[in-house]
Amino acid sequence: MKEQTNWLIVGLGNPGREYEKTRHNAGFRAIDRIAEKLGVKIDKLKFQGLYAQVNTATGKLFLLKPQTYMNLSGRSVLQLSAFFKVPPARIIVLFDDISLEPGKLRLRKDGSAGGHNGIKSIIQELGSQDFPRVKIGVGAKPHPEYDLADWVLSTFSAQEEKFLAPAIDRAADAALCIMEKGIAEASNRYSGKA
């Protein structure tokens, strides 16, 4: 019998209705899309987050939305991954990236936080940066003096939303592809333009 492997897909964002449509919540939107595709609800409250469990042919897949606020996301990720014994290499994180324009995706096998506080928290808590990521472009600040926190907590223009909606869908597919086919194949298929 084939050994069972557990996977965890994490969408980063801030809890609360007022943050729902902000740039910083692109990860939440993408993981909600995965849940839709798999026909599950992310509604179990534990591990300082909301999660869902999906039984697959090869093991269990967990979908997690940390409810800690962005800067402490790693606490939730560590708790769930430790409990269900999911190693960093099988933790896929979906999150917003201001260095990419809306509609673009970038997949990474590992790496530093690149200035993203949610990723920084996960690296800190796991003690590893060896986890795959799907970065969702949310656009750069309009000018250098613009406050970063204000920017990531702002909402998308109607024009940006047109590019973002299909990118959210592709980010969901990309995360599932990493799990099924590996990061190289997923990068070939999904990195770049929507």
Question: What is the predicted role of each segment?
Answer:
Residues 1-110, 120-135, 141-147, 154, ...:
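Nucleotide and nucleotide-moiety/phosphate-recognizing core
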Residues 115-118:
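Hydrophobic alpha-helical segments within soluble ligand-binding/sensing domains
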